């Protein structure tokens, strides 16, 4: 199996203008490749290549995949916001046309990768794509790393934590946030960042080792953007790999065309999400 995280350039102003990033993880949790793609067709072609001669591929796309609402926010976004997890605010009106994610789903379908709201854990020979939220995953990993995920008032701890700000701010604050995110990834059980075949050159067209980069305010915003996409792609790939392994806890909030998101969640966080889903009559599994 291969697990592909896609940091999609989906936001208004960047969709179809900026490149997206793909990060590939094997069954052991090792990052074996990454690349950059400019269009939905290119992304689907890369995914098809990564899955060739493999027993399936799971793709986690870090972008809203199902956007049924003309304006406002999706129900799953309101659930995450109540729990103080970062949520993408998406409506059809903000895109002014077909969202890039819908174009991507159509291209992935052409290469045999189907949209799902629940990829099956521990099952090979499946080719599916699911929505993930890299910012929420990063916050959950930070919570788990601190040991606070199962102790005390979870809601209070989440509200007290700052949301990751990898994209906004000056170069000093962005570089500091990126260094913190990379450190969390380095310490995440089940994820191996450094695998020997990746480069420390941020300008390399593919296979960049994010753990070897000297991230600093001396970099340009464009270079920092490139690192952000590598980090987000890694978080997306980790999310689907963690779910597939079925050991450390995960949860799907929402269902089908109404929008759903796959999150790392165990015990206390899972119970908190389930409580909010029950109150809002939002499906979860």
Regions from the PLM with identified roles:
Residues 1-285:
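RNase H-like (RuvC/DEDD) metal-dependent nuclease/polynucleotide-processing core
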């Amino acid at each position: 199996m291969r697990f592909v995280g896609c940091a999609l350039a989906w936001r208004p102003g960047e969709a179809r203008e900026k490149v997206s990033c793909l990060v590939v993880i094997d069954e052991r949790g090792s990052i074996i490749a990454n690349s950059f793609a400019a269009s939905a067709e290119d992304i689907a072609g890369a995914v098809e290549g990564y899955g060739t001669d493999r027993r399936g591929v799971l793709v986690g796309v870090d972008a809203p995949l199902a956007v049924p609402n003309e304006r406002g926010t999706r129900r799953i976004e309101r659930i995450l916001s109540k729990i103080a997890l970062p949520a993408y605010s998406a409506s059809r009106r903000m895109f002014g046309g077909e969202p890039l994610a819908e174009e991507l789903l159509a291209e992935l379908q052409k290469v045999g990768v189907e949209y799902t709201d629940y990829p099956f854990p521990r099952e090979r020979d499946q080719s599916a794509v699911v929505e993930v939220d890299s910012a929420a995953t990063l916050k959950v990993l930070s919570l788990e790393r601190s040991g606070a995920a199962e102790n005390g008032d979870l809601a209070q701890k989440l509200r007290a934590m700052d949301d990751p700000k990898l994209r906004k701010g000056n170069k000093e604050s962005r570089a500091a946030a990126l260094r913190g995110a990379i450190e969390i990834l380095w310490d995440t059980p089940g994820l191996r960042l450094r695998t020997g075949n990746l480069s420390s050159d941020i300008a390399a067209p593919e296979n960049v080792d994010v753990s070897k980069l000297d991230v600093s305010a001396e970099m340009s915003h464009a270079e920092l953007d490139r690192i952000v996409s590598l980090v987000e792609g890694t978080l997306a790939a980790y999310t689907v790999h963690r779910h597939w392994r079925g050991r450390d806890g995960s949860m799907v909030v929402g269902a089908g065309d109404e929008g759903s998101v796959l999150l790392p969640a165990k015990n206390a966080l899972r119970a908190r999400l389930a409580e909010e889903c029950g109150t809002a009559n939002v499906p979860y599994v």
